[in-house]
Amino acid sequence: MPAIMEKNMLVSESLRTTELLGHVKPIDSVVTWSSPGSSRQAIGEAFKNTIEEIERAAVRGEPADSDAFFVADLNGVYRQLLRWHAKLPRVQPFYAVKCNPDPKVLALLNKFGTGFDCASKGELEQILGLGVSPDRIVYANPCKAITYVRYAASKGINLMTFDNADELYKVKQHHPNSRLLLRISTDDSNSLCRLSLKFGASLDDTGKLLDIAKSLELNVVGVSFHVGSGSYDPSAFLDAIQRSRQVFDQGLERGFNFDLLDIGGGFMNDSFDGVADLIRSALDTYFDPSIRVISEPGRFFVSSSFTLAVNVIAKRKLDDEEKVMYYVNDGVYGSLNCILFDHQHPVARVLKCGSRFVYNDLVGTGQHRCFIWGPTCDSLDVIANDAHLPYELNVGDWIYFEDAGAYTVAAASCFNGFKTSRIVYLDTDILD
């Protein structure tokens, strides 16, 4: 399908969806859309320009900031928003702030009326600071501190989740006017992060919890679930929607009038279209159109829109080893914490080798086997223990990692005195 035709189809569906959701600004009325191909070219130019400026500063004898850096394609976030509304027009996204709380990403999503999934007072404060209305926030943490519950009540943030009896008693005392979603457990055995190990009531317990909520005169308005962060099993959504239908029926039996279903997150970029088709069909089968449906996508919006560049700061060859060891200026204590916390496996690619920029070079992985270490003094700080690159690198060369927008900047630390990586933004005019 020609890119411009695909764009127009997405925009048409997005405009209809934003009208239904009451968004202030039509999605495509205020920005210039760019295709993925043009964005990739812009990313390459941003890498080249930034590195050349670093090198010019070094030649001038100025302190050169050769630290690792991201290139953030804001238009990429926007394209994913269009794609979401085209494939899941019934489902209003509430962006999972924990995934990447970058201020410009949040501002972009806020501009187009996206809701926000928050899990702490800090996230609530950040989103309210953007001028977001409290009714566009879901406090999606089933186990909240009392002080945080009080804060939510003071700010009019009413929609929140629970999965246990103690939370109900807590909410009754500190936020009795809340609108509650019962978080249920799911089969998330095929996800990167199995959230049901920690959260979610089983179907054996949901009826009891609804009885307690009824006795406390609390307003339970629906059901929420999460199939796990980074789910690779489309059938997990079908199973969770079927379970939600059972809990809706339990609520009806107890006199509740549920009108909201939160289908959580876990959406992967490469499997999204097929998963969305399944979700649309399941929602039509099990839930009347009058039921409002929201979701909590995170990585789907931001993962592919951030690319990380790291500099080779040291190189070590061992006589008895075939592999070369490279040491770079970001690692698992910084932007690549996703290796530990999100079970990701970033793929290293050569960005600059000697005087050659080779971004997006499709040479292949090559036969040069290597270790890639982060910069800290901890041996846990290993990015790859068997990477394959097409070229042997030297100190001063650059490597890049794509799909670096999810669970990277959010948890980066300054351990060992290393700074967090800066961000170079593309398409900032989209925020005007």
Swiss-Prot record:
GO terms for cellular component: cytoplasm; cytosol; nucleus. PROSITE patterns: ODR_DC_2_1 (PS00878). The keyword Lyase applies. It is found in: Cytoplasm. The active site is at C377 (proton donor). Catalyzes the first and rate-limiting step of polyamine biosynthesis that converts ornithine into putrescine, which is the precursor for the polyamines, spermidine and spermine. Polyamines are essential for cell proliferation and are implicated in cellular processes, ranging from DNA replication to apoptosis. This is Ornithine decarboxylase. It comes from Schizosaccharomyces pombe (strain 972 / ATCC 24843) (Fission yeast). The gene is spe1.
